Amino acid sequence: YEKHLDKIFEKKILSDDISYYLHRPSATDPNMAPEGQDAFYVLVPVPNNLSKVNWIEEGDKFKDLVLDKMDKTVLPGIKENVVSDFYLTPDYFEIDLATLYGSGFSIQPKFSQSAYFRFHNQSEIYKNLYFVGAGTHPGAGMPGVLSSAKVLDNLFKWKAIY
């Protein structure tokens, strides 16, 4: 895994040896897919746009690489059963969402920027400046972002009492 992260963050290249996060929302919410079918979300870490990866050329090839790996490991038969798919690249994050270099998750996931070391939800310099989102405590991803909002909500409630 360390070699994979080194390729992404230090060498800024795509790797054939990928890791991914796989989520199946239809397992807990049947409305996420037509009856008898499933919905999956796959998150694959890739380098940001400082890498100069040409996503117009590489996007479909990389998607096929991801499907091949899932087909050989956790979801045999996935390739021939996909009804509809799409993917987002760092280009989308940079152009449509105006994130720096197409970064989808804020700061680099390393120990010195994790857990307590992430940006705190209240500025240590300006007393009325607050932060919420993927780059703040407690962390990235949708659960982290929602938890960050909850932390801030609790902080405001605590300040109102005291």
Q: How should these model regions be labeled?
A:
Residues Y1-V46, L97-Q113:
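FAD cofactor-binding and catalytic pocket of flavoenzymes
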Residues H4-D17, W55-I95:
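Flavin-binding catalytic cores
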Residues S15-Y21, P76-P138:
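A glycine-rich dinucleotide-binding beta-alpha-beta segment and adjacent secondary-structure elements
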Residues P30-M32, K52, G139-G141:
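Short helix/loop capping segments that flank catalytic or ligand/cofactor-binding pockets
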Residues P34-D68:
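Conserved FAD/dinucleotide-binding core of flavoprotein oxidoreductases
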Residues V42, M70, L129, G133, ...:
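Hydrophobic, well-ordered secondary-structure elements that form the walls
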Residues L88-P90, K157-Y162:
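Active-site-proximal substrate-binding core of FAD-dependent oxidoreductases
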Residues S114, A134-K157:
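A conserved FAD-binding loop/helix module that cradles the flavin
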